[in-house]
């Protein structure tokens, strides 16, 4: 069990609800993932669902904690307004804060992000800020009152994995008491393992499951990957060595010679 913004959870995998081939694929993938937290966008929720069933009705059946996001916002004002709508609509003070500053790589706009985070925290929100792995930006968000940081592993939807493990490792070292969740760029279960081996608290992903040939099966793979990575970190992995070291201690006389000489 772990604590995320006051909620006790078993799963360290958070899953998005966009881009699935159908509502059935989404529901099965979320079920297989074991996640207890799903992200949802205001714009996506207000659109009609597939197969005659509204998206919102499908989401309610999942019985997960909702993490609404401010996807599509490009300045603090828009993000704050969207967050207020989400709080009223979904009855939650959680908000995944996204303020995009570039169309090419969907990188967050740092100045507007910090501004929005500060205002939303003052208004009683629990802010989950989508940010880069920039140490100074993350420090400013913490100074603004963020107890959670969600740095990217790589640009959204790229599937490139962790493009700067050193920066992420530095964040873990510098913010030991902050909840760190990788958000964006994860493409393979092995990427999720790597995240958790760095000591991160969780992984949030969407595209890697939604666009897989078999979303439900991929969700299962990510479920096990996150567990394996976390257990590896908790178990204490051996340090790398520059030279070989025998795993079996050697003695002067082979054991079968010792037996024959008895």
From Swiss-Prot:
- Asked if the Swiss-Prot or TrEMBL record annotates the protein with the keyword Ligase, the reply is no
Sequence positions that bind 1-deoxy-D-xylulose 5-phosphate: 157, 184-185, 206-207
Work out whether the entry's keyword set contains Transmembrane. Answer: no
Coiled-coil positions are none
- Mind telling me which Pfam families this protein's record contains? ThiG (PF05690)
Record-annotated active site: 96
- What pathway or pathways are given for this protein in its record? Cofactor biosynthesis; thiamine diphosphate biosynthesis
What is its subcellular localisation?
Cytoplasm
- Function of the protein: Catalyzes the rearrangement of 1-deoxy-D-xylulose 5-phosphate (DXP) to produce the thiazole phosphate moiety of thiamine. Sulfur is provided by the thiocarboxylate moiety of the carrier protein ThiS. In vitro, sulfur can be provided by H(2)S.
Record family assignment? Belongs to the ThiG family.
The protein here is known as Thiazole synthase
Per the record, the gene is thiG
């Amino acid at each position: 069990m772990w604590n995320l913004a006051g909620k006790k959870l078993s799963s360290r995998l958070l899953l998005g609800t966009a881009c699935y081939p159908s509502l059935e694929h989404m529901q099965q993938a979320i079920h297989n993932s074991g996640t207890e937290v799903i992200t949802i966008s205001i714009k996506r929720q207000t659109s009609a669902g597939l197969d005659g069933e509204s998206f919102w009705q499908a989401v309610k059946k999942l019985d997960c904690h909702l993490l609404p996001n401010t996807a599509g916002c490009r300045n603090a004002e828009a993000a704050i307004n969207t967050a207020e709508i989400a709080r009223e609509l979904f009855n939650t003070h959680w908000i995944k804060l996204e303020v995009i500053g570039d169309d090419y790589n969907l990188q967050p706009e740092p100045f507007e992000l910090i501004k929005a985070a500060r205002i939303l925290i003052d208004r009683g929100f629990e802010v989950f800020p989508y940010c880069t792995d920039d140490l100074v930006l993350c420090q400013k968000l913490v100074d603004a009152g963020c107890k959670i940081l969600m740095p990217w592993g790589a640009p959204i939807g790229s599937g490139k994995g962790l493009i700067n493990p050193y920066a992420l490792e530095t964040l873990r070292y510098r913010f030991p008491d902050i909840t760190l969740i990788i958000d964006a760029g994860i493409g393979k279960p092995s990427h999720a393992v790597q995240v958790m081996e760095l000591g991160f608290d969780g992984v949030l992903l969407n595209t890697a499951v939604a666009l897989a040939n078999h979303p439900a099966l991929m969700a299962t793979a990510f479920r096990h990957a996150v567990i394996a990575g976390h257990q590896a970190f908790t178990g204490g992995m051996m340090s790398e060595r520059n030279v070989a070291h025998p795993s079996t201690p050697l003695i002067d006389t082979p054991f079968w010679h010792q037996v024959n000489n008895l």
